[in-house]
């Protein structure tokens, strides 16, 4: 819902790799398609890790545009690790790390200043915060201010963003 509410704003920031103004829409359609297809699993009892694995597969099948594909690849890598239902802080870190690696390796020409940068920053800040927190939800929540800082630096990493006066969508 949050993403859908802000998709037009994201679309307005979309200048890289193609300035076609559809980044927000592509991510929304990717998630909506995956959620709609998860109705096929309604009558099945699934543990959270198994649900995430199926959801990530549906995201990839329904992915739209570069942003939808990269988001789907991250979720696939993440779900691959937590499908065992181990949501300890260490395993969530491994899942984030695997999600980032999967998204990075699955991107034809990975560039700093994009959503890949935010995924890497999440991985790095999560690792740092693991030293002081045990709850993965709290750790992820505490990464948000740092991720906003990194996002605000994306124009310095990718000249096309600086030229347009925007952060990465």
Question: Where do the protein language model's features map onto the residues?
Answer:
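N-terminal loops that bind phosphate or other acidic moieties
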Residues: 1-169
